[in-house]
Amino acid sequence: MAKLRKTLGGTDWPVCKALMRQIETQSTVTLSRWAVDHAAREYLPLCGEAPALKAAVEGCRKHLTGQLSLKELKPLLREASAAARDTEGAVEQAAARATATACAVIQTPTNALGYLFYGAAAAAYSKAGTEDASRWDDLARAELEQALEELRAVSVPDEPNPAKINWNC
């Protein structure tokens, strides 16, 4: 059996470079809304019973509409991160990490790329299984390409307040 990785993808992949360039053009709010919606749709269903993750997604949505302060949101983000660490199973844990990391984009805009690496692993493992490593990279690449298309679709043209991004990779 191939060694499972927590994440799939890499910053040297052309699709990741394109994602990075697109992320750099958008505001933290746009990135957060996109990441939370994408993770809730694609990865949260793979997590099984995950009340802390569901609460974090709802908390982020409330924060983005002004119904919850960042101070009130932070405990939900911490609980989601802890729940992701404690999740069992390769698919479930990768999906949980993707969801928790997506929720934290509002605090750390570079998570808009990081959550996708966890999500790519969750998608690949759920589609190919954890035994068939030969398909993982292709499935991960397809997942990242889909995410890039979705980000481009919701991007604000000529965003006046792009997030301050410092890629440490």
Where are the regions that the model predicts?
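Short, low-complexity, intrinsically disordered N-terminal peptides in bacterial proteins
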Residues: 1-2, 169
